[in-house]
Amino acid sequence: MEKEKGLLIVLSGPAGVGKGTVCSALRKHDTNIQYSVSATTRAPRKGEVDGVNYFFKSREQFEAMIEKEELLEWAEYVGNYYGTPIQYVRETIDSGKDIILEIEVQGALKVRERFPEGVFIFLMPPSLAELRSRIVGRGTETEEVINKRMNVAKEEIEMMKKYDYVVENDEVELAVDRIKAIVTAEHCKRERLIEKYHQLVEVE
């Protein structure tokens, strides 16, 4: 019988909404979910490790990856490139494991064009005031960049209608529980299983 493929789960939302925190907590709960490491040209933040948090690239290196079509998606956000290496994503799905992409809204919409069967989840902040507080709390951004991120966030929230699900990140554990419920339900969808069970009937 054909092995069930994994799901491509795309999680995105405004900067500061807590995508990274939710993804880390989700992986602790579900060992079948692999985390897709993105490539970026932004400078590493304190504690970030190349190849673990991101693949840190120069602009020249990143543009070479674009030219060779080695990225599932890519976008330029607040002056830096972000993108998803395609080979790792395909290999993970084919192995039967789910893979989660934590990416910006622009990138998520590009992935939707190429992988319409993916599961697209928009992570919402409880409020814009809370979102600003989280960004300020990082202590890594200037006031100018914070204001720019907030303006972009308002535009991104308008794009949530293009997603399959919206999850509010009021508390990390609650957000994780909601996403786990979504993933479980998606694995039970008829269209994902029909070929597998057609083969079962044919064998018998």
UniProtKB/Swiss-Prot annotation:
- Binding site residues for ATP: G13, P14, A15, G16, V17, G18, K19, G20
Q: Which GO terms describe its cellular component?
A: cytosol
Domain (Guanylate kinase-like) spans 6-184
Which InterPro entries does UniProt cross-reference here? GK/Ca_channel_bsu, Guanylate_kin-like_dom, Guanylate_kinase, Guanylate_kinase_CS, P-loop_NTPase
- Give TM regions: none
Q: Which Pfam families match?
A: Guanylate_kin (PF00625)
Q: Can you tell which superkingdom this protein's organism belongs to? A: Bacteria
Coarse class of the primary localization is: cytoplasm
Query: Which molecular function GO terms apply here?
Result: ATP binding; guanylate kinase activity
**Location in the cell:** Cytoplasm
Q: Which reaction does it catalyse?
A: GMP + ATP = GDP + ADP
Keyword tags: ATP-binding, Cytoplasm, Kinase, Nucleotide-binding, Transferase
- What EC number(s) has UniProt assigned to this enzyme? 2.7.4.8
PROSITE patterns xref list: GUANYLATE_KINASE_1, GUANYLATE_KINASE_2
Regarding protein family, the annotation reads:
Belongs to the guanylate kinase family.
PANTHER family assigned: GUANYLATE KINASE, GUANYLATE KINASE-RELATED
Instruction: Say what the protein does.
Output: Essential for recycling GMP and indirectly, cGMP.
Q: Which HAMAP family does the record associate with it? A: Guanylate_kinase
Name the UniProt record assigns to this protein: Guanylate kinase
Q: What organism, scientifically named, is this protein from?
A: Halalkalibacterium halodurans (strain ATCC BAA-125 / DSM 18197 / FERM 7344 / JCM 9153 / C-125) (Bacillus halodurans)
Q: Which gene encodes it?
A: gmk
